[in-house]
UniProtKB/Swiss-Prot annotation:
Lineage start: Eukaryota, Metazoa, Chordata, Craniata, Vertebrata
CC terms in the record's Gene Ontology section: nucleoplasm; nucleus
Domain NR LBD: 222-460
Summary of the knockout phenotype: Mice are blind, show juvenile ataxia, duck gait, hind paw clasping reflex as well as delayed onset of male fertility. They suffer a degeneration of the retina during postnatal development with severe defects in photoreceptor cell morphology. Mice display reduced anxiety and learned helplessness-related behaviors. They also show a significant increase of the circadian period. Knockouts for isoform 1 display duck gait and lack amacrine and horizontal cells with an excess of ganglion cells in the retina.
Summary of subunit composition and partner proteins: Monomer. Interacts with CRX.
Gene of this entry: Rorb
Protein name, UniProt field: Nuclear receptor ROR-beta
Tissues and organs where the protein is expressed, per its UniProt entry: Expressed in inner and outer neuroblastic layer as well as in the ganglion cell layer of the developing retina. Expressed in bone marrow osteoprogenitor cells.
Length: 470
Protein backbone atom coordinates (compact mmCIF):
# COMPACT_ATOMS: atom_id res chain seq x y z
CA UNK A 1 0.00 0.00 0.00
CA UNK A 2 2.91 2.35 0.63
CA UNK A 3 4.58 4.11 -2.28
CA UNK A 4 8.36 4.22 -2.48
CA UNK A 5 9.77 6.40 0.24
CA UNK A 6 11.97 9.40 -0.67
CA UNK A 7 15.72 9.22 -0.24
CA UNK A 8 17.49 11.85 1.81
CA UNK A 9 20.53 13.54 0.40
CA UNK A 10 22.77 12.18 3.13
CA UNK A 11 21.74 9.12 5.03
CA UNK A 12 19.28 6.97 3.14
CA UNK A 13 15.54 6.70 3.67
CA UNK A 14 13.86 9.76 5.16
CA UNK A 15 11.87 9.25 8.32
CA UNK A 16 8.45 9.94 6.88
CA UNK A 17 6.81 8.79 10.11
CA UNK A 18 8.01 11.99 11.80
CA UNK A 19 5.24 13.73 9.84
CA UNK A 20 1.88 13.26 11.64
CA UNK A 21 -1.10 11.73 9.89
CA UNK A 22 -2.56 14.34 7.55
CA UNK A 23 -6.08 13.25 8.42
CA UNK A 24 -6.15 13.05 12.23
CA UNK A 25 -2.70 14.08 13.45
CA UNK A 26 -1.84 10.69 14.94
CA UNK A 27 1.57 9.07 14.41
CA UNK A 28 1.84 8.19 10.74
CA UNK A 29 3.08 4.91 9.29
CA UNK A 30 3.91 6.01 5.74
CA UNK A 31 2.22 7.04 2.51
CA UNK A 32 -1.11 5.29 2.01
CA UNK A 33 -3.37 5.89 -0.98
CA UNK A 34 -1.22 8.88 -1.88
CA UNK A 35 -1.30 10.65 1.51
CA UNK A 36 0.78 10.36 4.68
CA UNK A 37 -1.58 8.73 7.20
CA UNK A 38 -1.70 6.55 10.27
CA UNK A 39 -2.75 2.89 10.18
CA UNK A 40 -6.21 3.81 11.47
CA UNK A 41 -7.01 6.30 8.72
CA UNK A 42 -5.50 4.00 6.09
CA UNK A 43 -7.80 1.18 7.20
CA UNK A 44 -10.80 3.49 7.40
CA UNK A 45 -10.28 4.73 3.84
CA UNK A 46 -9.73 1.21 2.51
CA UNK A 47 -12.98 -0.02 4.09
CA UNK A 48 -14.91 2.98 2.79
CA UNK A 49 -13.76 2.23 -0.76
CA UNK A 50 -14.27 -1.53 -0.57
CA UNK A 51 -17.81 -1.15 0.69
CA UNK A 52 -18.70 1.89 -1.43
CA UNK A 53 -19.90 3.30 1.86
CA UNK A 54 -22.30 6.21 2.03
CA UNK A 55 -21.99 8.11 5.29
CA UNK A 56 -24.09 10.93 6.69
CA UNK A 57 -23.11 13.64 9.14
CA UNK A 58 -25.46 14.13 12.11
CA UNK A 59 -24.21 17.70 12.54
CA UNK A 60 -23.31 20.38 9.98
CA UNK A 61 -20.71 18.54 7.88
CA UNK A 62 -17.86 20.46 9.47
CA UNK A 63 -16.81 18.12 12.29
CA UNK A 64 -13.29 18.45 13.62
CA UNK A 65 -11.30 15.32 12.76
CA UNK A 66 -8.39 14.65 15.08
CA UNK A 67 -6.92 11.66 16.87
CA UNK A 68 -9.36 11.84 19.77
CA UNK A 69 -12.64 12.17 17.88
CA UNK A 70 -11.84 10.76 14.42
CA UNK A 71 -14.35 7.94 14.94
CA UNK A 72 -17.27 10.22 15.79
CA UNK A 73 -18.20 11.22 12.23
CA UNK A 74 -17.37 8.90 9.35
CA UNK A 75 -18.77 11.30 6.77
CA UNK A 76 -16.48 14.19 7.70
CA UNK A 77 -13.52 11.85 8.10
CA UNK A 78 -14.00 10.46 4.59
CA UNK A 79 -14.46 13.93 3.13
CA UNK A 80 -11.19 15.01 4.72
CA UNK A 81 -9.45 11.94 3.28
CA UNK A 82 -10.71 12.80 -0.20
CA UNK A 83 -9.98 16.52 0.15
CA UNK A 84 -6.37 15.79 1.04
CA UNK A 85 -5.96 13.55 -2.00
CA UNK A 86 -6.47 9.96 -0.84
CA UNK A 87 -7.41 7.75 -3.79
CA UNK A 88 -7.52 4.06 -4.70
CA UNK A 89 -5.62 4.92 -7.87
CA UNK A 90 -2.72 6.42 -5.94
CA UNK A 91 -1.17 2.99 -5.33
CA UNK A 92 -0.72 2.54 -9.12
CA UNK A 93 1.43 5.59 -9.70
CA UNK A 94 4.78 3.89 -9.01
CA UNK A 95 7.83 5.89 -8.03
CA UNK A 96 7.53 9.49 -6.92
CA UNK A 97 8.91 12.28 -9.08
CA UNK A 98 12.04 14.16 -8.02
CA UNK A 99 9.91 17.21 -7.25
CA UNK A 100 7.66 15.15 -4.97
CA UNK A 101 10.65 13.59 -3.22
CA UNK A 102 12.30 16.96 -2.63
CA UNK A 103 9.06 18.42 -1.29
CA UNK A 104 8.54 15.50 1.07
CA UNK A 105 12.15 15.63 2.22
CA UNK A 106 11.75 19.33 3.06
CA UNK A 107 8.63 18.58 5.09
CA UNK A 108 10.42 15.81 6.98
CA UNK A 109 13.25 18.19 7.82
CA UNK A 110 10.77 20.80 9.04
CA UNK A 111 9.05 18.34 11.39
CA UNK A 112 12.35 17.00 12.70
CA UNK A 113 13.45 20.54 13.52
CA UNK A 114 10.13 21.24 15.22
CA UNK A 115 10.43 18.08 17.35
CA UNK A 116 13.95 19.06 18.38
CA UNK A 117 12.75 22.53 19.41
CA UNK A 118 9.91 20.99 21.44
CA UNK A 119 12.32 18.67 23.24
CA UNK A 120 14.59 21.58 24.13
CA UNK A 121 11.65 23.64 25.37
CA UNK A 122 10.27 20.78 27.49
CA UNK A 123 13.71 20.15 28.96
CA UNK A 124 13.98 23.82 29.92
CA UNK A 125 10.53 23.79 31.52
CA UNK A 126 11.40 20.68 33.52
CA UNK A 127 14.58 22.33 34.80
CA UNK A 128 12.68 25.45 35.84
CA UNK A 129 10.04 23.41 37.67
CA UNK A 130 12.75 21.43 39.43
CA UNK A 131 14.16 24.65 40.89
CA UNK A 132 10.71 25.73 42.06
CA UNK A 133 9.92 22.49 43.87
CA UNK A 134 13.36 21.42 45.08
CA UNK A 135 13.37 23.41 48.32
CA UNK A 136 9.85 22.45 49.41
CA UNK A 137 10.24 18.79 48.52
CA UNK A 138 13.61 18.02 50.03
CA UNK A 139 13.01 19.48 53.51
CA UNK A 140 11.43 17.63 56.39
CA UNK A 141 10.35 14.49 54.57
CA UNK A 142 12.73 11.85 55.84
CA UNK A 143 10.88 11.49 59.14
CA UNK A 144 7.43 11.39 57.58
CA UNK A 145 5.13 8.80 59.10
CA UNK A 146 2.62 7.60 56.50
CA UNK A 147 0.89 5.05 58.71
CA UNK A 148 -2.86 5.52 58.42
CA UNK A 149 -5.99 3.78 59.53
CA UNK A 150 -8.78 2.33 57.43
CA UNK A 151 -12.00 3.37 55.87
CA UNK A 152 -15.59 2.43 56.55
CA UNK A 153 -17.90 0.04 54.75
CA UNK A 154 -21.10 -1.49 56.10
CA UNK A 155 -20.43 0.17 59.44
CA UNK A 156 -17.04 -1.52 59.86
CA UNK A 157 -13.47 -0.47 59.34
CA UNK A 158 -11.71 -2.00 56.33
CA UNK A 159 -7.91 -1.99 56.31
CA UNK A 160 -6.86 -0.74 52.91
CA UNK A 161 -3.80 -2.34 51.29
CA UNK A 162 -0.57 -0.40 51.25
CA UNK A 163 0.70 0.79 47.88
CA UNK A 164 4.37 0.18 47.23
CA UNK A 165 4.57 2.76 44.45
CA UNK A 166 6.98 2.75 41.54
CA UNK A 167 10.18 3.76 43.23
CA UNK A 168 10.50 1.43 46.23
CA UNK A 169 11.65 4.44 48.25
CA UNK A 170 13.42 3.79 51.53
CA UNK A 171 13.15 6.29 54.33
CA UNK A 172 16.80 7.20 53.92
CA UNK A 173 16.48 8.18 50.26
CA UNK A 174 15.72 11.68 49.02
CA UNK A 175 12.26 12.52 47.75
CA UNK A 176 11.76 11.83 44.02
CA UNK A 177 12.17 14.79 41.70
CA UNK A 178 8.79 16.20 40.75
CA UNK A 179 9.78 18.47 37.91
CA UNK A 180 7.67 16.65 35.35
CA UNK A 181 4.20 17.54 36.63
CA UNK A 182 3.08 21.13 36.64
CA UNK A 183 -0.43 21.37 38.04
CA UNK A 184 -0.97 24.73 36.37
CA UNK A 185 0.66 23.97 33.05
CA UNK A 186 -1.02 20.75 31.91
CA UNK A 187 -3.06 21.32 28.78
CA UNK A 188 -6.80 21.40 29.35
CA UNK A 189 -8.45 18.35 27.82
CA UNK A 190 -11.88 19.92 27.54
CA UNK A 191 -12.22 23.61 28.27
CA UNK A 192 -15.94 23.70 29.00
CA UNK A 193 -17.94 21.43 31.35
CA UNK A 194 -20.22 19.15 29.39
CA UNK A 195 -22.01 17.36 32.22
CA UNK A 196 -24.24 19.00 34.77
CA UNK A 197 -25.09 16.85 37.77
CA UNK A 198 -25.84 19.73 40.13
CA UNK A 199 -29.52 19.54 39.30
CA UNK A 200 -29.77 15.93 40.43
CA UNK A 201 -30.86 15.98 44.08
CA UNK A 202 -29.74 13.13 46.33
CA UNK A 203 -27.75 11.29 43.71
CA UNK A 204 -27.49 8.31 46.05
CA UNK A 205 -29.99 6.35 48.12
CA UNK A 206 -28.40 6.63 51.52
CA UNK A 207 -31.02 4.62 53.39
CA UNK A 208 -29.35 1.41 52.25
CA UNK A 209 -26.27 2.21 54.30
CA UNK A 210 -26.27 0.19 57.50
CA UNK A 211 -27.83 2.29 60.26
CA UNK A 212 -26.86 5.44 58.34
CA UNK A 213 -23.55 5.44 60.19
CA UNK A 214 -20.83 7.79 59.05
CA UNK A 215 -17.48 8.75 60.47
CA UNK A 216 -17.52 11.72 62.86
CA UNK A 217 -17.58 15.05 61.05
CA UNK A 218 -18.84 13.63 57.74
CA UNK A 219 -22.33 14.54 56.55
CA UNK A 220 -24.46 13.01 53.83
CA UNK A 221 -24.62 16.31 51.96
CA UNK A 222 -20.83 16.48 51.89
CA UNK A 223 -20.60 12.93 50.56
CA UNK A 224 -23.14 13.80 47.88
CA UNK A 225 -21.26 16.95 46.88
CA UNK A 226 -17.93 15.12 46.61
CA UNK A 227 -19.46 12.25 44.65
CA UNK A 228 -21.20 14.50 42.14
CA UNK A 229 -18.01 16.45 41.59
CA UNK A 230 -15.93 13.30 41.01
CA UNK A 231 -18.46 11.68 38.68
CA UNK A 232 -18.82 14.87 36.65
CA UNK A 233 -15.03 15.21 36.44
CA UNK A 234 -14.71 11.61 35.28
CA UNK A 235 -17.32 11.95 32.55
CA UNK A 236 -15.68 15.11 31.24
CA UNK A 237 -12.17 13.65 31.09
CA UNK A 238 -12.61 10.23 29.51
CA UNK A 239 -11.07 9.85 26.08
CA UNK A 240 -14.25 8.15 24.82
CA UNK A 241 -17.82 8.19 26.04
CA UNK A 242 -19.48 4.84 26.68
CA UNK A 243 -21.67 5.40 23.63
CA UNK A 244 -18.59 5.85 21.46
CA UNK A 245 -16.97 2.75 22.95
CA UNK A 246 -20.09 0.70 22.22
CA UNK A 247 -20.00 1.90 18.60
CA UNK A 248 -16.35 0.86 18.32
CA UNK A 249 -16.75 -2.45 20.17
CA UNK A 250 -16.60 -4.68 17.10
CA UNK A 251 -14.23 -2.57 15.02
CA UNK A 252 -11.19 -4.79 15.36
CA UNK A 253 -7.76 -4.59 13.82
CA UNK A 254 -7.50 -6.69 10.68
CA UNK A 255 -5.13 -9.60 10.30
CA UNK A 256 -2.84 -7.42 8.17
CA UNK A 257 -2.83 -4.66 10.79
CA UNK A 258 -2.04 -7.14 13.58
CA UNK A 259 0.84 -8.53 11.52
CA UNK A 260 2.08 -4.98 11.01
CA UNK A 261 2.17 -4.43 14.78
CA UNK A 262 3.93 -7.76 15.28
CA UNK A 263 6.55 -6.91 12.67
CA UNK A 264 7.48 -3.64 14.35
CA UNK A 265 10.80 -3.44 16.11
CA UNK A 266 10.73 -3.74 19.89
CA UNK A 267 11.84 -0.14 20.35
CA UNK A 268 9.23 1.18 17.88
CA UNK A 269 6.34 -0.53 19.67
CA UNK A 270 7.64 0.51 23.10
CA UNK A 271 7.72 4.10 21.90
CA UNK A 272 4.23 3.76 20.43
CA UNK A 273 2.84 2.38 23.70
CA UNK A 274 4.63 5.06 25.72
CA UNK A 275 2.92 7.72 23.61
CA UNK A 276 -0.51 6.12 24.10
CA UNK A 277 0.01 5.75 27.86
CA UNK A 278 1.16 9.36 28.14
CA UNK A 279 -1.92 10.58 26.32
CA UNK A 280 -4.16 8.61 28.69
CA UNK A 281 -2.25 10.00 31.68
CA UNK A 282 -2.89 13.56 30.51
CA UNK A 283 -6.61 12.85 30.82
CA UNK A 284 -6.04 11.45 34.32
CA UNK A 285 -4.18 14.62 35.31
CA UNK A 286 -7.10 16.70 34.09
CA UNK A 287 -9.49 14.40 35.99
CA UNK A 288 -7.55 14.98 39.21
CA UNK A 289 -7.42 18.74 38.70
CA UNK A 290 -11.22 18.88 38.52
CA UNK A 291 -11.68 17.05 41.83
CA UNK A 292 -12.38 19.72 44.43
CA UNK A 293 -10.83 17.88 47.35
CA UNK A 294 -7.72 17.01 45.35
CA UNK A 295 -7.01 20.62 44.47
CA UNK A 296 -7.33 21.54 48.15
CA UNK A 297 -4.30 19.37 48.96
CA UNK A 298 -0.89 21.01 49.02
CA UNK A 299 0.85 21.06 45.66
CA UNK A 300 3.57 18.69 46.85
CA UNK A 301 0.98 16.04 47.68
CA UNK A 302 -0.96 16.60 44.46
CA UNK A 303 2.16 15.91 42.43
CA UNK A 304 3.23 12.91 44.49
CA UNK A 305 -0.22 11.32 44.23
CA UNK A 306 -0.25 11.78 40.47
CA UNK A 307 3.28 10.47 39.99
CA UNK A 308 2.59 7.34 42.00
CA UNK A 309 -1.04 6.74 41.04
CA UNK A 310 -1.70 7.98 37.51
CA UNK A 311 -0.84 4.69 35.79
CA UNK A 312 -3.02 2.81 38.28
CA UNK A 313 -5.96 5.01 37.25
CA UNK A 314 -5.16 4.38 33.57
CA UNK A 315 -5.31 0.66 34.31
CA UNK A 316 -8.71 1.02 36.01
CA UNK A 317 -10.00 3.10 33.11
CA UNK A 318 -8.76 0.43 30.72
CA UNK A 319 -11.73 -1.73 31.68
CA UNK A 320 -14.02 0.78 29.96
CA UNK A 321 -12.25 0.13 26.66
CA UNK A 322 -11.89 -3.62 27.13
CA UNK A 323 -14.17 -6.17 25.45
CA UNK A 324 -14.28 -9.28 27.67
CA UNK A 325 -16.22 -11.23 25.04
CA UNK A 326 -13.20 -11.47 22.75
CA UNK A 327 -10.43 -10.27 25.08
CA UNK A 328 -9.54 -7.18 23.08
CA UNK A 329 -8.67 -3.63 24.09
CA UNK A 330 -9.04 -0.35 22.23
CA UNK A 331 -5.65 0.66 20.85
CA UNK A 332 -5.19 3.41 18.27
CA UNK A 333 -8.83 3.56 17.26
CA UNK A 334 -9.70 -0.15 17.01
CA UNK A 335 -9.80 -3.22 19.23
CA UNK A 336 -7.03 -5.79 19.28
CA UNK A 337 -5.87 -8.72 21.39
CA UNK A 338 -2.68 -9.55 23.24
CA UNK A 339 -0.99 -10.80 20.08
CA UNK A 340 -0.73 -7.19 18.87
CA UNK A 341 1.86 -6.48 21.55
CA UNK A 342 4.19 -9.44 20.92
CA UNK A 343 7.00 -7.19 19.73
CA UNK A 344 7.24 -5.56 23.17
CA UNK A 345 8.91 -8.67 24.53
CA UNK A 346 6.85 -8.31 27.71
CA UNK A 347 4.22 -11.03 27.42
CA UNK A 348 3.85 -11.35 31.19
CA UNK A 349 3.06 -7.64 31.57
CA UNK A 350 0.53 -7.73 28.72
CA UNK A 351 -1.09 -10.88 30.15
CA UNK A 352 -1.36 -9.35 33.62
CA UNK A 353 -2.92 -6.16 32.28
CA UNK A 354 -5.46 -8.04 30.15
CA UNK A 355 -6.32 -10.41 33.01
CA UNK A 356 -6.90 -7.49 35.35
CA UNK A 357 -9.13 -5.69 32.84
CA UNK A 358 -11.20 -8.82 32.27
CA UNK A 359 -11.60 -9.44 36.01
CA UNK A 360 -12.61 -5.85 36.65
CA UNK A 361 -15.12 -6.02 33.79
CA UNK A 362 -16.71 -9.05 35.47
CA UNK A 363 -17.90 -6.77 38.29
CA UNK A 364 -19.98 -4.82 35.74
CA UNK A 365 -19.18 -1.44 37.26
CA UNK A 366 -21.19 1.62 36.29
CA UNK A 367 -19.56 4.88 35.22
CA UNK A 368 -20.31 6.27 38.70
CA UNK A 369 -18.47 3.37 40.32
CA UNK A 370 -15.50 3.57 37.97
CA UNK A 371 -15.23 7.29 38.66
CA UNK A 372 -15.25 6.90 42.43
CA UNK A 373 -13.00 3.85 42.49
CA UNK A 374 -10.49 5.62 40.22
CA UNK A 375 -10.34 8.60 42.53
CA UNK A 376 -9.98 6.36 45.60
CA UNK A 377 -7.05 4.58 43.94
CA UNK A 378 -5.43 7.90 43.06
CA UNK A 379 -5.98 9.63 46.39
CA UNK A 380 -4.15 7.13 48.58
CA UNK A 381 -2.62 8.16 51.93
CA UNK A 382 -0.06 5.35 51.68
CA UNK A 383 2.11 7.07 49.07
CA UNK A 384 5.62 7.90 50.20
CA UNK A 385 6.72 11.48 50.97
CA UNK A 386 3.24 12.97 51.50
CA UNK A 387 3.34 16.09 53.65
CA UNK A 388 -0.28 15.77 54.83
CA UNK A 389 -1.16 12.05 54.69
CA UNK A 390 -3.96 12.49 57.22
CA UNK A 391 -5.70 15.02 54.99
CA UNK A 392 -5.36 12.64 52.04
CA UNK A 393 -6.76 9.81 54.16
CA UNK A 394 -9.84 11.81 55.17
CA UNK A 395 -10.58 12.62 51.54
CA UNK A 396 -10.18 8.99 50.51
CA UNK A 397 -12.54 7.87 53.29
CA UNK A 398 -15.24 10.21 51.99
CA UNK A 399 -14.76 8.81 48.49
CA UNK A 400 -15.13 5.26 49.79
CA UNK A 401 -18.32 6.25 51.62
CA UNK A 402 -19.73 7.57 48.35
CA UNK A 403 -18.59 4.46 46.48
CA UNK A 404 -20.22 2.20 49.05
CA UNK A 405 -23.53 4.05 48.66
CA UNK A 406 -23.45 3.79 44.87
CA UNK A 407 -22.61 0.09 45.04
CA UNK A 408 -25.47 -0.60 47.44
CA UNK A 409 -27.80 1.23 45.07
CA UNK A 410 -26.65 -0.65 41.95
CA UNK A 411 -25.70 -4.13 43.16
CA UNK A 412 -27.43 -6.79 45.18
CA UNK A 413 -24.01 -8.14 46.08
CA UNK A 414 -22.76 -6.48 49.26
CA UNK A 415 -19.26 -7.77 48.59
CA UNK A 416 -18.54 -5.60 45.54
CA UNK A 417 -16.63 -2.95 47.49
CA UNK A 418 -14.54 -5.59 49.23
CA UNK A 419 -13.80 -7.16 45.84
CA UNK A 420 -12.68 -3.80 44.49
CA UNK A 421 -10.41 -3.12 47.45
CA UNK A 422 -8.95 -6.61 47.09
CA UNK A 423 -7.90 -5.72 43.53
CA UNK A 424 -5.70 -2.80 44.61
CA UNK A 425 -2.61 -5.00 45.25
CA UNK A 426 -3.03 -6.42 41.74
CA UNK A 427 -3.19 -2.91 40.29
CA UNK A 428 0.00 -1.99 42.12
CA UNK A 429 1.72 -5.21 41.02
CA UNK A 430 0.90 -4.63 37.34
CA UNK A 431 2.19 -1.05 37.51
CA UNK A 432 5.35 -2.16 39.30
CA UNK A 433 5.88 -4.80 36.60
CA UNK A 434 5.57 -2.05 34.00
CA UNK A 435 8.31 -0.14 35.80
CA UNK A 436 10.55 -3.21 35.86
CA UNK A 437 10.02 -3.88 32.16
CA UNK A 438 10.78 -0.25 31.35
CA UNK A 439 14.06 -0.43 33.23
CA UNK A 440 15.06 -3.60 31.38
CA UNK A 441 14.21 -1.92 28.08
CA UNK A 442 16.11 1.23 29.05
CA UNK A 443 19.24 -0.75 29.84
CA UNK A 444 19.39 -2.04 26.27
CA UNK A 445 17.97 1.07 24.56
CA UNK A 446 18.94 4.10 26.69
CA UNK A 447 19.07 6.50 23.75
CA UNK A 448 15.57 5.53 22.59
CA UNK A 449 14.10 6.22 26.04
CA UNK A 450 16.05 9.42 26.63
CA UNK A 451 15.42 11.03 23.25
CA UNK A 452 12.21 9.59 21.79
CA UNK A 453 9.92 8.78 24.72
CA UNK A 454 7.49 11.53 25.82
CA UNK A 455 9.02 13.76 28.53
CA UNK A 456 6.05 13.26 30.86
CA UNK A 457 6.35 9.47 30.56
CA UNK A 458 10.05 9.63 31.45
CA UNK A 459 9.40 11.90 34.41
CA UNK A 460 6.77 9.58 35.82
CA UNK A 461 8.40 6.19 35.33
CA UNK A 462 12.12 6.79 34.92
CA UNK A 463 13.81 7.11 38.35
CA UNK A 464 16.91 8.81 36.95
CA UNK A 465 15.10 11.02 34.48
CA UNK A 466 16.05 14.14 36.42
CA UNK A 467 19.63 13.63 35.32
CA UNK A 468 18.50 13.42 31.71
CA UNK A 469 16.28 16.47 31.74
CA UNK A 470 18.78 18.82 33.32
Amino acid sequence: MCENQPKTKADGTAQIEVIPCKICGDKSSGIHYGVITCEGCKGFFRRSQQNNASYSCPRQRNCLIDRTNRNRCQHCRLQKCLALGMSRDAVKFGRMSKKQRDSLYAEVQKHQQRLQEQRQQQSGEAEALARVYSSSISNGLSNLNTETGGTYANGHVIDLPKSEGYYSIDSGQPSPDQSGLDMTGIKQIKQEPIYDLTSVPNLFTYSSFNNGQLAPGITMSEIDRIAQNIIKSHLETCQYTMEELHQLAWQTHTYEEIKAYQSKSREALWQQCAIQITHAIQYVVEFAKRITGFMELCQNDQILLLKSGCLEVVLVRMCRAFNPLNNTVLFEGKYGGMQMFKALGSDDLVNEAFDFAKNLCSLQLTEEEIALFSSAVLISPDRAWLIEPRKVQKLQEKIYFALQHVIQKNHLDDETLAKLIAKIPTITAVCNLHGEKLQVFKQSHPDIVNTLFPPLYKELFNPDCAAVCK
